[in-house]
């Protein structure tokens, strides 16, 4: 089993390294195109390219002596040396109607098989199949086999065979034994798979750690597939897809898993649904297929949205931050179309995560509103339920993460489709103590002014019972403001413009100061704790 675990890890790390290579290759190609357009004066085309890729390509520049024209010239020279003729780069296009009907090429996919109308490359040998080399040893083995075959053909023909042209202008000589001795040696050889796997793990991990491809996983620099390859020539779908694409989260929230204090069960389930299926797809098949829906419910300010920000930062997925204003339209029929386009775009950009915040505003119980429910709202809810059913029956890596402060108002059909329902409760005493220590450390100098504290964290953790994480942050901020307010009078009375400001020295924040702030800052959702616990007993799914 140990060997199998190592093999899974190797496959995961190699897949991550290959994804980094592909991402870097696509980004480098777009930067080369942008550089060429700007160099040739195609300013409007360069601006359109920058808007469609959703990243600022002008922040990057090509290296010295590298441009698109030089790369094309070098390829033509290489092709001529290898095949004694220049490559055919372009061909006459089809008529306009046929070209519109043809499907655009999927972005990010490398297609090696050419069309039948394109002139193929000359065949080197009828029985030889060329593959992309993966290491330097391939060149030595392949060159040695070709040298042996040429030597045997010369001996059979009496040395009168015509001289073959060198592929790249290099003469390669064999350094190993004859083929017969080599075959006997290979039959006696014992292959140490364990050492091979360990070497592969070490090389892959070093490659990823060194980040030699300059591929930063920052969401703001991630390439987004062009919408044109998804919608084709339908103008209505293009407009709806553009509306949804604006909610693809490209900023970096800079929230890590370790930054979230507590919420261990929620973090574990999110990793099971988003992170692990991408890293170890061999494990998530059949009955072990990943979760498609997760509901985070609990009092406001307990970290539900913060957990979604961690997903956007840590998980290498396309993150759709959807609100009610995105998928609700005043025009008849547009709401359900927006929902359908949302899920189709999520499949197109897979792996992806759809985050629905304040879910009760979109999926409240049907037929319970005063005066009956509007027809458009009912159709939109039905379409959302149908699309989530389609996710459950497919193998697409699309995950729905929903958050709600009022789970008892959600439609029961939506609860069934959200397979996991996690209560994000008020923090425990240990979590509250860690939060206070995080926001008010003994010494902090982040704003340029040194602030010192002398707090009994254990006592304050017990005194803040019923406070949410957001409430505790508010209390810490108010406690830190108390010594700052004392120096406002001195700063306002300093009228001389030529004299320097006096040295600012803030008083130490003590435990008594913190307790005084607690007396005037009450928790926001303490009264709802029992209601959440009662709903959890009836609908919990962990």
From Swiss-Prot:
Chain segments annotated as transmembrane: none
Region (Disordered): 94-126, 142-168
SMART domains cross-referenced by the UniProt entry: AAA, LisH
Pfam families according to UniProt: AAA, AAA_lid_3, LisH
EC class: isomerase
Keywords: ATP-binding, Cytoplasm, Cytoskeleton, Isomerase, Microtubule, Nucleotide-binding
InterPro entries in the record: AAA+_ATPase, AAA_lid_3, ATPase_AAA_core, Katanin_p60_AL2, LisH, MT-severing_AAA_ATPase, P-loop_NTPase
Biased composition (Polar residues): 114-126
Location of the LisH domain: 25-57
Similarity comment: family membership: Belongs to the AAA ATPase family. Katanin p60 subunit A1 subfamily. A-like 2 sub-subfamily.
Protein name as it appears in the record: Katanin p60 ATPase-containing subunit A-like 2
Source organism of this protein record: Xenopus tropicalis
Lineage of origin: Eukaryota, Metazoa, Chordata, Craniata, Vertebrata
């Amino acid at each position: 089993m140990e060997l199998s675990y190592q093999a899974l890890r190797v496959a995961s790390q190699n897949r991550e390294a290959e994804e980094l290579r592909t991402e870097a290759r696509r980004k480098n190609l777009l930067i080369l195109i942008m550089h060429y357009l700007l160099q040739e004066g195609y300013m409007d085309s360069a601006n359109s390219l920058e808007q469609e890729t959703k990243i600022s390509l002008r922040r990057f520049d090509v290296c010295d002596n590298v441009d698109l024209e030089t790369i094309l010239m070098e390829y033509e020279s290489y092709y001529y040396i290898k095949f004694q003729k220049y490559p055919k780069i372009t061909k006459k296009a089809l008529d306009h109607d046929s070209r519109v009907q043809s499907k655009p090429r999927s972005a990010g996919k490398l297609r090696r098989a050419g069309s039948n109308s394109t002139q193929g490359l000359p065949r080197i040998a009828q029985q030889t199949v060329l593959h992309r080399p993966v290491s330097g040893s391939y060149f030595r083995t392949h060159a040695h086999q070709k040298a042996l075959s040429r030597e045997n053909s010369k001996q059979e023909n009496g040395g009168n065979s015509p001289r073959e042209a060198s592929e790249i202008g290099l003469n390669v000589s064999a350094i190993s034994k004859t083929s017969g001795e080599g075959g006997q040696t290979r039959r006696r050889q014992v292959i140490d798979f364990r050492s091979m796997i360990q070497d592969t793990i070490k090389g892959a991990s070093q490659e990823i750690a060194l980040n030699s491809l300059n591929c930063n996983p920052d969401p703001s620099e991630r390439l987004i597939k062009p919408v044109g390859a998804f919608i084709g020539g339908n103008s209505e779908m293009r407009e709806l897809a553009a509306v949804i694409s604006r909610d693809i989260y490209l900023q970096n929230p800079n929230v890590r898993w370790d930054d979230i204090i507590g919420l261990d069960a929620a973090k574990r389930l999110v990793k099971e649904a988003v992170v692990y299926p991408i890293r170890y797809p061999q494990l998530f098949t059949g009955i072990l297929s990943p979760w498609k829906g997760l509901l985070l419910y609990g009092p406001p300010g307990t970290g539900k949205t913060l957990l979604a920000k961690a997903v956007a930062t840590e998980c290498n997925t396309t993150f759709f931050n959807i609100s009610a204003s995105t998928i609700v339209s005043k025009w008849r029929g547009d709401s359900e179309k927006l929902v359908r386009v949302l899920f189709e775009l999520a499949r197109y950009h897979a792996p992806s995560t759809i985050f629905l915040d304040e879910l009760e505003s979109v999926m409240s119980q049907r037929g319970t509103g005063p005066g009956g429910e509007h027809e458009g709202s009912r159709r939109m809810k039905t379409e959302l339920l149908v699309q989530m059913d389609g996710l459950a029956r497919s193998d697409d890596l699309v995950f729905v993460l929903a958050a709600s402060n009022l789970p008892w108002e959600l439609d029961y059909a939506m609860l069934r489709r959200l397979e996991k329902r996690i209560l994000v409760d008020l923090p425990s005493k240990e979590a509250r103590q860690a939060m206070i220590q995080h926001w008010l450390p003994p010494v902090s100098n982040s704003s340029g002014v040194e602030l010192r504290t002398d707090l009994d964290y254990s006592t304050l953790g017990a005194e803040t019972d019923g406070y949410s994480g957001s409430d505790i942050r508010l209390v810490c901020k108010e406690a830190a403001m108390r010594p700052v307010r004392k120096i406002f009078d001195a700063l306002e009375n300093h009228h001389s413009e030529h004299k320097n400001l006096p040295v600012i020295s803030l008083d130490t924040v003590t435990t008594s100061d913190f307790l005084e702030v607690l007396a005037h800052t009450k928790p926001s959702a303490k009264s709802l704790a029992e209601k959440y616990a009662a709903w959890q007993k009836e609908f919990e799914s962990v």
